[in-house]
């Protein structure tokens, strides 16, 4: 489905991001994954190469909150491959600090990591995609962007921001053949969820109409669809991947 495509995936070393990288490789894309540390990038690359030595995958670890550093990396990728077809902004942090305990510095840190960093990757990519006649951008939002969360204001605020960025860019960039969408995962079996004791997991499952916790591959499948020609007329969509938790 993605044969010959060049994809950049931020936050691609573990969890949902790693699943997206793997899914894209399985479907013929060449992938450049971004991670926060060289150690985690190397570990992810080694794991992927062990699974299939033929996969064309490489990695980098620019600071996503440094606009120049990200732009330099994006431009280097473009020089090497001649294009960037797909950008997946998956990197981000969760947060549940209560409002009464959250100072402005902490609030700004979450916004910086979850919104500003997304913009930093999008801006240079858009310039290149416009020149090449199109492209696809996928942002990772969250189900809390639809209804907020009872504990912690910074994280849902940041994901509402991702939604606004996604929808506005879809309207702005459609004329250039650039599609912009987001996925909004629900409760997903990441490392954090997997570490929970069974007595805490069961109440979570009870809130999900489909009766199970999502897997990283569920989100990766949605990202595969959005990146493929099957979604050629889909843009500005915030695609819930949450087992009907929010509908």
What are these regions (language model features)?
Residues 134, 212-241, 246:
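C-terminal substrate-recognition "lid" of short-chain dehydrogenase/reductases
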Residues 6, 13-15:
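Conserved glycine-rich cofactor-binding loop
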Residues 127, 171-175, 232:
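Alpha-helical segment proximal to the catalytic Tyr-Lys
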Residues 142:
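Residue(s) in the substrate-gating loop at a strand-loop-helix junction
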